[in-house]
Amino acid sequence: MRIRVVLVEPLYEGNVGSVARAMKNFGFSDLVLVRPCEIEDFGLAMASHAREVIEGARVVDGLGEAISAANLVVGTTGVRGRTTDRHLRVPSLSPKELAERLQGGRGEVALLLGREDDGLSCEELAACDIVV
């Protein structure tokens, strides 16, 4: 199973660098940035040994382009168990349950991480197959 990390409108270059570093530490390199902030020296410094993850990242204008080839789209959220006009929930799994479900799987997974201030929108969560 191939995992693509998708950062949706990241606000802070340091966070992009930190995600790239964490990705490399766990053996991932496929990063897609949806309408990102500028990534300059600080973001690259935070990436440390994972600078090539940032340099190889694909930058896209919309979420649809970022997830178009994915067989499974997984959204992340800190809000659980509510359905309101502002918070839409699709099937929810814990990180452990997701890992168990993905073991031995084939295809491509897009793992969406939302904005630092507002997370993923209701519309973006609706595009997900699973929420963690």
Task: Describe these PLM feature segments.
Residues M1-V132:
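Post-transcriptional modification and biogenesis factors for structured RNAs
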